[in-house]
Amino acid sequence: MILLPQSLFEQIISHARECAPHECCGLVGGNSTTTRTVYPLRNIASEPLVTYEAAPEDLFAAQRAMRQRGEQLLAIYHSHPRSKDPEPSATDVRLAYYPTAVYFIVGLGDREPCLRAFRISDREGRWEPVEYAIAADTNH
C-alpha cells in the first residue's frame, strides 16, 4: 500500500482541475511507500484532450530534483477529465514504461474527483488496482 499525504492528494487534484479539459500529468517522489513530493509536468501531447506526454525538460528537471532530495520515483499521475471511475486506457498500458511505479489516474467526470491507483505491465498488457491511503500531513 502507498501512503499519500492529504496535501499531495490535493496538489494532484488541483493540477488535474487546472488542466481540464486537457489531461494533466506529473510524477510523485518519495521513499519506500511514503510519497513526499508532487512534480507537476506540462502535457505537450498533440491531442491533450485524450492523452498525455510529459515535456522532456520538465521530466528531466523533476528527476534531477528527486535525486537532489534523495527521493525515488514512486508514482506517475495523469487525469481522465471526463471519467467518473478512471481505469488505464489501452494507450496508458502501452506507454507504461515504469513497471515499479504506481500509476495514479484522476477522474473528473463526477461532482467529486476520483483518484485510483494501478500497477501497469506494458509487457503483459495488463493492469491491476493498487491500494493507497490518504494520510494526515506530517512535517518531514
PLM region spans:
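Acidic/histidine-rich, metal-coordinating catalytic segments
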Residues: 79
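Conserved beta-strand-loop surface patch within small alpha/beta domains used
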Residues: 1-73, 82-140
